[in-house]
């Protein structure tokens, strides 16, 4: 059982809960629109496929609130950042973006980090993942490449919020196996 976190104040918690609820509301509006769309089943299937890539973020924030596991004041800004990512992904999905565009995977000369979610086959919940994408990967290239995948396990103070935050910034902290050892 994770230890109790710090008191971050009711006002901050209320603001995060409202922002998480807004993400969920915006997502539901997309689902409802797809149900009435002429191509409803295709549009709805696309949204269902992309749903974990969005809703894993408010879930992480809500779980952190429910379990009172904010371990530093910085975790509040991390939570805000994750909800911003969810909103940006909703905007991209509404614009018809591909999965790669939704998760911001592009061709880059730099390492990239992807953080998102998948739907658990055990309990249908959204579970976080992180992927380290090596530099110089072309998203349309069919050649096999090494990508390191991180799944959230158990940690005394590693909430899903902390996991998603860690795996969505600072790619320099990861080695992809095809680069020289640091000096």
Predicted regions and their residues:
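Sec-exported extracytoplasmic/periplasmic mature domains
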Residues: 25-35, 62-70, 88-95, 153
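Intrinsically disordered, low-complexity coil segments
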Residues: 29-49, 108-110, 121-124, 135-144, ...
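Amphipathic, heptad-repeat alpha-helical segments
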Residues: 1-54
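Amphipathic alpha-helical packing elements
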Residues: 56-57, 63
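A domain-start/cap signature at the N-terminus of enzymes
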Residues: 2-6, 67-68, 72-145
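Extracytoplasmic/secreted envelope proteins and their assembly/folding machinery
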Residues: 13, 17-20, 24, 58, ...
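Short, charged, amphipathic alpha-helical segments
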Residues: 44-56, 73-84
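Active-site machinery of serine-nucleophile hydrolases
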Residues: 144-147, 151-183
């Amino acid at each position: 059982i994770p230890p109790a976190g710090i008191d971050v104040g009711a006002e901050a918690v209320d603001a995060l809960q409202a922002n998480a609820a807004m993400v969920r509301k915006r997502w539901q509006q997309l689902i409802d629109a797809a149900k009435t769309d002429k191509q409803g089943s295709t549009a709805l299937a696309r949204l269902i496929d992309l749903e974990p890539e969005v809703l894993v973020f408010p879930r992480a924030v809500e779980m952190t609130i429910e379990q009172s596991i904010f371990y530093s004041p910085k975790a509040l800004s991390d939570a805000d950042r994750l909800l911003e990512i969810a909103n940006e992904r909703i905007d991209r999905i509404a614009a018809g973006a591909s999965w790669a565009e939704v998760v911001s995977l592009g061709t880059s000369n730099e390492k990239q980090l992807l953080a998102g979610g998948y739907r658990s086959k055990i309990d249908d919940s959204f579970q976080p993942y992180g992927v380290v994408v090596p530099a110089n990967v072309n998203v349309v290239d069919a050649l096999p490449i090494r990508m390191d995948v991180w799944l959230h396990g158990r940690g005394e103070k590693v909430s899903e919020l902390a996991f998603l935050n860690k795996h969505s910034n600072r790619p320099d902290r990861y080695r992809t196996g095809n680069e020289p050892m640091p000096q």
